[in-house]
């Protein structure tokens, strides 16, 4: 049962809207509990509905290219990187957009096999493999991690069915099972070598949510310059974000001393506090509390 309506993200003078609110109430016989203005907040975007995809690149020392998979998910994993002055984060969907980034990230996806086949067909897989052959680092997260292995099998038809070859950049194979892994994870990253060795021992506070098993108990794996993890929220800890960017700067012969990363937990809480304040100021909270107390 609907007890009230709320107008959200309103731009303009609420007084001009008031006659319309009265008309709405007369038509639907449900009270309007408030008009929330458009609030300039920085909160996590919905998957595939982000303005981040269309942002113009900024000039920066470090260029990070995230593959814009058709079924990309959890891409807010990389938001912390965008707050670092020395870093530009781009989302690319074609080989011609890739350029020569300092790091390629393969993000999570709602369908690993179909998105890998998409990369194979449009040439991005070959471009990523060429990047790896040139000694440049690659990081795969969740579904992107699975793509980097030798093979992906789906005997139960969970995603695509059958078996396809992976990119062959990590010595691992993935098999999808009928049960999804959902787990919170805290700790420090396992020891790795190569360009991103500074990630070794860095703290994380994240989660795993994925289909499939990849035959390793490590939270971070690597072979030469290619790295993979199932962890989402990897860069929410500023120490880990800073370690990644400093490693990339050292690879280019740049001084990493000035790299500062945002404390994402504190930053997010500040944004949600601003959202809560905006809601309280805009809504008839007494009426809302009354509805809550009375129940449906």
List where the protein language model places each region:
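Short, flexible coil/turn micro-motifs enriched in small/turn-prone residues
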Residues: 103, 135-139, 161, 223, ...
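C-terminal lobe/tail of nucleotide-utilizing enzymes
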Residues: 1-90, 95-102, 169, 173-296
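Cysteine-nucleophile active-site neighborhood
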Residues: 109-195, 201-205
């Amino acid at each position: 049962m609907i007890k009230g309506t709320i107008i959200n993200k309103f731009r303009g003078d609420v007084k001009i809207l008031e006659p319309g609110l009265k008309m709405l109430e007369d038509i639907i016989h449900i009270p309007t509990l408030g008009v929330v203005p458009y609030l300039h907040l920085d909160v996590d975007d919905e998957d595939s509905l982000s303005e981040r995809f269309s942002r113009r690149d900024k000039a920066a020392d470090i260029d990070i290219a995230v593959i814009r998979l058709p079924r990309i998910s959890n891409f807010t994993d990389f938001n912390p990187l965008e707050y670092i002055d020395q870093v530009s984060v781009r989302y690319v969907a074609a080989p011609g957009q890739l350029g020569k980034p300092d790091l390629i990230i393969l993000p999570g996806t709602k369908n690993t096999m179909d998105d890998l086949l998409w990369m194979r067909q449009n040439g991005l897989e070959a471009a990523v493999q060429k990047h790896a052959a040139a000694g440049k680092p690659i990081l795969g997260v969740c579904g992107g991690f699975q793509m980097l292995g030798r093979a992906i099998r789906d005997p139960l038809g969970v995603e695509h069915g059958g078996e396809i070859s992976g990119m062959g950049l990590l010595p691992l194979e993935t098999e999808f099972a009928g049960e999804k892994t959902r787990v919170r994870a805290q700790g420090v990253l396992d020891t790795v070598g190569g360009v991103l060795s500074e990630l070794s021992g860095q703290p994380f506070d994240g989660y795993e949510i994925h289909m499939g098993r990849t035959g390793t108990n490590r939270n971070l794996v690597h072979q030469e310059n290619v790295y993979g993890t199932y962890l989402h929220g990897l860069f929410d800890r500023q120490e880990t974000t800073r370690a990644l960017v400093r490693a990339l700067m050292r690879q280019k012969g740049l001084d990493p001393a000035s790299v500062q990363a945002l404390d994402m937990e504190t930053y997010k809480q500040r944004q949600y506090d601003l959202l809560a304040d905006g809601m309280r100021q805009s809504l008839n909270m007494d009426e809302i509390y009354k509805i809550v107390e009375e129940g449906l």
